[in-house]
A protein has these predicted regions:
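Mid-to-C-terminal alpha-helical segments outside catalytic/metal-binding sites
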Residues: 1-15, 22-69, 77, 130, ...
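Histidine-centered catalytic micro-motifs
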Residues: 12-22, 176-180, 211
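Divalent metal-coordination and catalytic microenvironments
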Residues: 16, 69, 78, 112, ...
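Active-site environment of divalent metal-dependent phosphoester hydrolases
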Residues: 18-23, 85-88, 118-120, 146-149, ...
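Short aromatic-enriched loop/helix-cap "lid" or pocket-rim segments at secondary-structure transitions
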Residues: 23-29, 92, 125, 152-154, ...
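Alpha-helical scaffolding within the catalytic cores
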Residues: 60-67, 94-100, 124-128, 194-197, ...
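Active-site gating/metal-coordination segments in enzymes
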Residues: 77-191
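Catalytic pocket-lining loop regions of alpha/beta-barrel enzymes
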Residues: 138-139, 153-268, 296-299, 304, ...
Length: 345
């Protein structure tokens, strides 16, 4: 929890964290190298004291995450929202097994989402059903610009995507996290276009579409979609990290989101290990909108910040907002054997 200067406790859910492997050993081709190096360039938007050496950034440890998220980062609950990138990395950029093992170490503080790719068609649907039965996923992370063979991306409105979305809903997955934000080299910017969210949100109103990175650089497109679709949410990861190097720009982003969506549909995420939650949360809690922006959209308040930092995501995932959780508390779940083999990809 974050404690304000007045002593008030703020419950924090980091809705977008990663354990990735961008090591030289795991890189399959030049595209994998380009991807992790582009990630590292984004990482350098951090305050200097939070910038890691490149080799550590390529593959950090479970202990790094525990320290940066739970011990130092004010986070009470964290949610893995990974990407696979099987065409770039031998064993995937993110590992289901590694994420699940970490979740089992901290079952009262971690939710591990996974992914699906509609280009896997029927085989992927069967894999989804098996995995939901085994792992009980509450959400998925979709990466519409991911390369697969000759394909350089897909759309939420593709026929197979609709089948996956409908099956997800039938299986009890309600939270659909979609990367609709800045492009990472070598992926294509247009494949992350936010426009396809509009139709699926209208036709599948019982699903929650969390648009990660709030559609940047297409913020206006996103806000006008979200204004008319009550099941569309803004994920602040990436955008909120601009609070350090581009505070005015971030103030413009958050003021637009508050005006069009309201504070109940904005969700905090650090995108760790792109950035660490500690400095982001500290700067966000100190944020006051410039007078000219506040005159149009209103000032951001403590109650709004409480909703954004934890209460909104807790509501979507049925997380109890209560007393602070202490790092290293007893595990309440017996370990299970991990699934062998790679996902369908």
């Amino acid at each position: 929890m974050f404690t304000t200067k007045s002593g008030e406790k703020i419950f924090v859910v980091d809705g977008h964290v990663h354990l990735w492997d961008g090591s030289d050993k795991n890189i399959k081709n030049r595209y994998g190298e380009e991807f992790i190096k582009c990630f590292y360039d984004y990482h350098k938007l951090s305050p200097k004291e939070y910038v890691w050496p490149y080799k550590k950034y390529q593959k950090y440890t479970d202990e790094d995450l525990e320290q940066d998220i739970f011990q130092n980062g004010y986070v009470d609950f964290a949610i893995f929202n990974p990407q696979y990138l099987g065409d770039f990395y031998h064993h995937g950029f993110s590992s289901l097994e590694r994420n699940e093992a970490f979740r089992k170490k901290h079952p009262d503080r971690v939710i591990a989402n996974w992914f699906w790719d509609p280009r896997n068609e029927e085989a992927g649907l069967k894999q989804l059903e098996q995995d939901v039965e085994k792992y009980g996923w509450k959400g998925v992370k979709l990466y519409t610009a991911e390369w697969k063979g000759d394909s350089k991306g897909w759309k939420l409105t593709d026929p197979w995507s609709y089948r996956y979305l409908q099956r997800s809903q039938e299986l009890g997955i309600k939270n659909i996290h979609v990367h609709k934000g800045p492009t990472i080299r070598p992926l294509n910017k247009d494949a992350f276009d936010v426009g396809d969210v509009d139709e699926v949100a209208s036709l599948l109103p019982d699903l929650n579409f969390i648009v990660e990175h709030c559609g940047l650089p297409r913020l206006n497109d996103f806000t006008f979609i979200a204004a008319q679709e009550p099941n569309v949410y803004a994920g602040l990861s990436v955008a909120i990290a601009l609070i350090h190097t581009r505070p005015r720009y971030f103030s413009e982003i958050i003021s637009e989101l508050l005006f069009w969506l309201g504070p109940e549909r904005i969700l905090f995420g650090s995108d760790y290990a792109l950035w660490q939650p500690k400095w982001i949360i500290e700067k966000f809690m100190d944020l006051e909108l410039p007078e000219d922006l506040a005159a149009e959209t209103g000032q951001i308040t403590l109650e709004m910040k409480k909703k954004i930092l934890g209460e909104n995501t807790a509501r979507l995932y049925n997380i109890s907002v209560g007393e602070p959780k202490h790092f290293g508390s007893a595990v309440s779940e017996a370990p299970e054997p991990l699934r062998k083999g790679a996902p369908v990809a």
